[in-house]
């Protein structure tokens, strides 16, 4: 387990490390023994609510190659939810030293990611697979549980931001992937073409880029971030430029939801002071996606000289989504467009209360088409989409609206923001691509 000397901050609080976090919050800790049965009871209460059962099914879809009983699957899901809650709270205390009040409103903003978006960290926490505590019947009890965890965390100083802080907890609670063996996880040939392979031997230089396509809890990524940051700042680079260039240079993905949550948290902590003061909006370049197979182009959607279209499975029977290449190639465009959709989804739901469902859907699709086809000055994506790309996005949006009307959750947006990562990562050239991660489960 990574470990460093525990220190004390100027405020007199202990600066935790990976080992002390395991001691305080690991499987043998009083904190876990109190939180786990409460979380499990809350889940049992709402697991048949459609949006909760959907998140659980989607999470289960990422557990490929593992044969567990239904009881063991639920137990693991609750344990991973526990660690994901800790990650959110640690990140909040890293970015804001003020105490967490315990109010439901504040804790909800931490759980669903609104707090981090207000800090200009757009995608750190999305409406992911661990936000089931937002379900109204358990929201207040879930917030009380988070407040108890926050009170336990308040004894520590997280401002220093030890990057591998949560790695030990991840190793304790997350099962080792069946894909990993003593030989590590080989890099698929289609992605190896994106850059020189690196067998975790050396860290990138200040001007080199690195991709870790099986990033696990992010140990190699955060080491790369630290090396690039130190080298750039030592040679006098501007802090804003350093932040933006690091985010472009060090990127990763993983097919395990908790791994991505921990890797993003570790990446955030590794950025340190670059994100603790004012900075422009940023995306943390760690994505929930897999690389076992190349991205699939849907030839049936492509007509003549039209643009390429990629198909993404949902994990639900018969449900697939299509994204035009111009959107799939651009993580900023992905985040921006899908980040606008919650307003349209809610609008469709509100319209159905006063008009025919099909009329409501078409009205919202017309409004979104107008947005896609119009110039968007003073935004990250000022140019309108082509007519063909807009049509593809509208078909996907219609599917999302119909899903939302049945199960009002934004979890699909989380999936679709992340799934195209192999597309936009494969089309650029990284200086180094990590082809083994046997040291990082």
What is each PLM-predicted segment?
Residues 176, 294, 440:
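Active-site loop signature of alpha/beta-hydrolase-fold enzymes
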Residues 259, 440-441:
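Catalytic P-loop NTPase motifs of RecA-like helicase/translocase cores
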Residues 266, 431-440:
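Amphipathic alpha-helical repeat scaffolds
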Residues 254, 423-432:
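A short acidic, Gly/Pro-enriched loop at the edge of an enzyme's catalytic core
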Residues 164-169, 191, 195, 219, ...:
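Generic alpha-helical secondary structure signal
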């Amino acid at each position: 387990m990574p470990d460093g000397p525990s220190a004390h901050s100027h405020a007199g609080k202990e600066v935790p490390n990976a080992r002390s976090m395991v001691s305080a919050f690991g499987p043998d800790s009083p904190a876990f023994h109190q939180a786990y049965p409460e979380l499990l009871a809350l889940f049992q209460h709402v697991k048949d609510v459609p949006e909760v059962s959907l998140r659980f099914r989607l999470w289960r879809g990422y557990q490929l190659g593992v044969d567990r009983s239904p009881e063991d699957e639920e137990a693991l899901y609750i344990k991973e939810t526990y660690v994901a809650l800790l990650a959110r709270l640690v990140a909040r205390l890293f970015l804001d030293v003020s105490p967490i009040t315990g109010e439901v409103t504040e804790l909800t903003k931490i759980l669903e990611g609104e707090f981090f978006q207000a800090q200009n960290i757009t995608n750190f926490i999305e409406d992911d697979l661990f936000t089931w505590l937002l379900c109204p019947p358990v929201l207040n009890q879930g917030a009380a549980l988070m407040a108890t965890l926050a009170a336990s965390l308040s004894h520590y100083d997280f401002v220093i931001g030890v990057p591998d802080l949560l790695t030990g907890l991840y190793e304790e609670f997350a099962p080792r992937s069946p894909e990993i063996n003593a030989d590590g996880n080989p890099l698929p040939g289609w992605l190896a073409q994106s850059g020189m392979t690196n067998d975790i031997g050396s860290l990138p230089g200040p001007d080199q880029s690195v991709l870790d396509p099986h990033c696990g809890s992010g140990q190699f990524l955060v080491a790369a971030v630290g090396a690039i940051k130190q080298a750039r700042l030592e040679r006098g680079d501007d802090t804003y430029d350093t932040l933006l260039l690091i985010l472009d240079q060090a990127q990763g993905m993983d097919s395990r939801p908790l791994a991505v949550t921990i890797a993003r948290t570790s990446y955030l902590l590794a950025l340190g002071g670059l994100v603790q003061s004012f900075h422009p909006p940023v995306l943390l370049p760690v994505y929930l996606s897999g690389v076992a197979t190349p991205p699939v182009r849907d030839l049936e959607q492509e007509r003549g000289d039209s643009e390429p279209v990629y198909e993404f499975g949902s994990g639900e029977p018969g449900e697939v989504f299509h994204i035009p290449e111009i959107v799939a190639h651009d993580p900023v465009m992905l985040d921006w467009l899908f980040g606008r959709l919650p307003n349209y989804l809610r609008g469709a739901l509100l319209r159905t209360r006063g008009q025919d469902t099909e009329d409501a859907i078409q009205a919202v699709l017309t409004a979104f088409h107008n947005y896609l086809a119009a110039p968007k000055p003073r935004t990250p994506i000022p140019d309108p989409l082509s007519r063909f790309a807009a049509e593809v996005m509208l078909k996907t949006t219609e599917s999302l609206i119909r899903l939302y009307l049945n199960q009002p959750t934004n979890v699909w947006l989380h999936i679709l923001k992340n799934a195209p990562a192999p597309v936009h990562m494969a089309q650029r050239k990284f200086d180094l691509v990590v082809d083994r991660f046997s040291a990082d489960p």
